[in-house]
Amino acid sequence: TLFPYTTLFRSVKFANILPVKKGLGDSETQAVMSDDDSYTLGNAILTNGQTGSAVEITTVDAFVRDQRLARVDFIKADIEGYERHMLRGARETLARFAPKLALCTYHLPDDPEVLETLIKEANPAYEVVQKRKKLYAAVPQK
């Protein structure tokens, strides 16, 4: 799990979940995120005068490579309209491992079309189902 908030680090109690203090995007960079842990509505938009902390942004592909992951089975993302950027940074992973996907499609008006296109460009074998503003994708087993 990649997520920038301190609360997550305190609350995760599962042995098979490792919180990583990074965000996901289409390039390796930095972003400024709010330090206010009381704000847990799913996003951290900074307005004029607010301060925050620098958070490292990586790609799914770079993370998989750096961690030498032998498999990736599932990617779930509700990242406030940044799903398309995450998918652009996951092309190699989608092509190589074909993980099942569960993504939100309600943040931007063209999310349903854009996200499906990005997935199928990375791996044309994916079958996509969209319902209730969610996108589910998997490569059928042979």
Language-model regions, residue ranges each:
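A detector for short metal-coordination/catalytic motifs
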Residues: T1
